A protein has these predicted regions:
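Short loop/turn segments that connect beta-strands within beta-propeller blades
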Residues: 65-68, 109-113, 153-157, 192
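Blade-terminus and WD-like Trp-Asp/Gly-His loop motifs, strongest in beta-propeller folds
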Residues: 43-49, 56, 87-95, 124-133, ...
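Beta-strand-rich domains and repeat architectures in extracellular enzymes and scaffolds
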Residues: 33-60, 81-85
Length: 192
């Protein structure tokens, strides 16, 4: 038991230090296109464009349904994962993006093999088959105190901050555009 706890702590320490620290440039330009007055919605609807594979979060596993057959995968088993949130399928249907609270965001194959640990990246969404958008956010227990919208290439480990505001949350991709919220504003940027 003690060895398992020590190994878990070592893994957590390594995860906090090593993954996806490579700052880089994924896009050559980030251009602000539009700013509208808006409040942050309390609910967000998932984009279910992919029909051939469906994924849903259920307790401590992820369900993958393909061609009518459902399998359960547990890519980050307990004690590392208490639950899976923000589960989504890549546009090409080959990878699953998910978050484990207090552990970070991961990418795995549809068979459950983890291929990338992205670290701190909340509300992650696919921009394309390689790039993931998310929030690197901090709060005081009730409100965001700082938050950046970040793009991460899960294959190369490149990371780029896309927002210029102190608080930027809940990115939503609509290629080549990305929409996100800043206090009382909906901001649209164009990526090149």
């Amino acid at each position: 038991m003690r060895k398992t706890i020590i190994n878990s702590l070592l893994l957590l320490c390594c995860m906090l230090i090593i993954p996806y620290t490579a700052e880089g440039q994924i896009f050559t330009a980030v251009e602000v296109i539009d700013v509208k007055e808006a409040a942050i919605p309390m609910e967000f609807k998932a984009n279910n464009a992919v029909k051939k594979v469906s994924i849903s979060s259920k307790q401590q596993y992820i369900e993958v349904t393909k061609r009518g057959k459902t399998i359960r995968i547990n890519p980050t088993p307990p004690p590392q994962a208490s639950m899976y949130i923000w589960v989504s399928l890549s546009p090409n249907g080959k990878y699953i993006l998910y978050n484990v609270p207090l552990r970070g965001t991961f990418v795995c194959t549809i068979k459950g093999k983890v291929v990338a640990e992205l670290g701190r990246l909340n509300a992650p969404v696919w921009y394309d088959n390689n790039i993931i958008l998310g929030m690197d956010d901090y709060d005081d227990g009730e409100n965001f105190t700082k938050s950046d919208v970040v793009a991460v290439n899960f294959r190369t480990a490149q990371k780029q901050i896309l927002s210029k505001e102190t608080i930027a949350v809940y990115p939503y991709p609509e290629k080549p555009f990305v929409h996100y919220f800043s206090p009382n504003k909906l901001i649209t940027i164009k990526l090149k």
